[in-house]
A protein has these predicted regions:
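C-terminal amphipathic alpha-helical interaction region
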Residues: 399, 404-486
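Interdomain hinge/lid region at the active-site interface
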Residues: 179, 204, 209, 224-331, ...
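Glycine/threonine-rich flexible loop motifs
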Residues: 69-86, 101
């Protein structure tokens, strides 16, 4: 009997997805380039299950019912293309390849176009949830043609995480939409993790919380509607773990140098390309880079002294303020992520449903959190919401707690504790809420040295000033008795020298 589904790549994620597919009633064939890996899987975790081992791509293809559906779980980039190039000659019209890795969305755009032009189908599917999610139900983000998605819908809706309002999967959009949404998910994840790390740093190094106290604090936070999440849950768990070799808290023995695989950088690069501000994600990526300078930081710590101010306030009150600062910063981080998804949807014609994106992240994935339901509701009430900060509930939350947020960041500055993501989030809020920013000066500078022109607030049009000439004239009329900024009551304002420029951008 032919199998319903095929899978290539038996690392842990591949194995767990294969078991998930089989457990949900879909017979599956598996292939791995290492025969030993395949044999080990079949003889242990897949023993006595409806999982068929194959030892060549030809055998895999022949074992599947048509139209064939084959999930690739290999490293992103060239390995995906290599597997696809070997598979394509073996497939027939209507057969489908699904890439479940963290591929760059532009690669997925290319692969969808190439496959569809030959009568084959291609789905780029983001998979979030790690090893546990892959086995028990991940959040899935499939993109490609809707017709291709409908063919795998019966399978993916079964294997995805299940929450109160349905499976954590939906048709994301055309081309690379699925991998784009997964990329932004990962960017938000970077922000979440950095914000939590900064909260930990403040609690430990400003008010001296022990790991036992940190476990209790994060455990309590995880019971709240605001901060209940997978990442807060595992953070609390981490603080309870003792290293058996030293009888010390394990987290304190881990080198403070965080790695990254690149999806955070991809998110930032895309945001810059689309002109979307994502300062919290950027701060998170930069913090990981700074952490990698371990040897330099150790050397610098012996040379560069920081402030000697010690915190002498109320410890419990500060813990509550850190909680408020963390939540406000988290709202800003998600606002940036959703704004980026909205901009990409318009630019690439993805037609994303932002409320639905929040819904499918409620379960299975790394950023799953209770407050995602609030984001879903916000976009259901107003699908054209310009920014999450403007949603009534989130707006009021920040207005009510911004005093604590600012106090925490001020305390961090006074005590020499870096909080780049907290600070970037507050800067984002303050910049977004201000009707006027100092970039009028920036634009004047650009026009001064590069004739980049400017617009005015008092009349229509695009203008350029001869700034050197204006400076000379201003010097001629100034006197020692009259400051440059002072204008006599009866003095007529001087006319700005302007020319009609060519409209240019830079």
């Amino acid at each position: 009997m032919a199998q319903s589904f095929g899978l290539i790549g038996l690392a842990v994620m591949g194995e767990n997805l294969a078991l998930n597919v089989e457990r949900n009633g879909f017979p599956i064939s598996v292939y791995n380039r290492s025969r030993d890996k395949t044999d080990a899987f079949i003889s242990t975790r897949a023993k006595d299950k409806n999982v068929v081992a194959t030892y060549s791509l030809e055998e895999l293809v022949q074992s599947l019912e048509r139209p064939r559906k084959i999930l690739i779980m290999v490293k992103a980039g060239a390995p995906v293309d290599a597997v696809m190039n070997q598979l394509k000659p073996l497939l027939e019209e209507g057969d489908m390849i699904i890439d479940g890795g963290n591929s760059l969305f532009t690669d997925t755009d290319r692969r969808v176009a190439e496959m569809e032009s030959t009568g084959l189908r291609f789905i780029g599917m983001g998979v979030s949830g790690g090893e546990e999610g892959a086995l028990n139900g991940p959040s899935l983000m499939p993109g490609g043609t809707e017709a291709a998605y409908r063919e795998i819908e019966p399978i993916v809706t079964k294997i995805a995480a299940q929450v109160d309002d349905g499976p954590c999967v939906t048709y994301i959009g055309p081309s690379g939409a699925g991998h784009y949404v997964k990329m932004v998910h990962n960017g938000i994840e970077y922000g979440d993790m950095q914000l939590i790390a900064e909260a930990y740093d403040l609690l430990k190094n400003v008010i001296g919380c022990s790991d036992r106290e940190l476990h209790e604090i994060f455990s309590e936070w995880n019971t709240t509607d605001e901060l209940n999440s997978f990442l807060i849950e595992i953070t609390a768990d981490i603080f309870s773990r003792i290293d058996p070799d030293t009888n010390q808290p394990l987290v304190e023995l881990i080198l403070d140098a965080a790695g990254q695989k690149g999806t955070g950088r991809w998110t930032i690069a895309s945001a810059l390309e689309l002109g979307v501000a994502t300062p919290t994600m950027t701060a998170a990526v930069t913090a990981r880079i700074m952490s990698s300078y371990k040897a330099e930081r150790v050397a610098a710590s012996k040379i560069l002294e920081g402030p000697s101010i010690k915190f002498d306030g109320d410890k419990k009150a500060f813990i509550n303020m850190v909680r408020d600062a963390l939540y406000c910063s988290k709202i800003c981080s998600y606002a940036q992520g959703m704004a980026l998804l909205g901009a990409a949807s318009k630019e690439y014609n993805y037609n994303l449903n932002l409320g639905e994106m929040a819904r499918i992240w409620k379960g299975g994935c790394i950023i799953r959190a209770g407050f995602l339901d609030k984001i879903k509701v916000a976009y259901q009430h107003d699908p054209n919401l310009a920014n999450l900060l403007l949603a009534p509930e989130f707006k009021q939350t920040i207005l009510d707690r911004q005093s604590a947020w600012r106090e925490v960041i001020a305390t961090a500055a006074k005590t020499g504790i870096p909080v780049p993501a907290f600070s970037a989030s507050l800067d984002y809020f303050d910049s977004y809420r201000r009707a006027s920013l100092p970039q009028n000066l920036t634009q004047a500078q650009r026009d001064y040295f590069g004739a980049h022109t400017y617009m005015r607030t008092d009349k229509e049009g695009i203008f350029h000033s001869e700034w050197t000439q204006l400076a000379k004239e201003s010097l001629q009329i100034s006197t020692p008795e009259v400051p440059l900024a002072h204008v006599e009551e009866n003095e007529a304002p001087r006319e700005v020298v302007e020319t009609a420029p060519v409209e240019t951008k830079s």
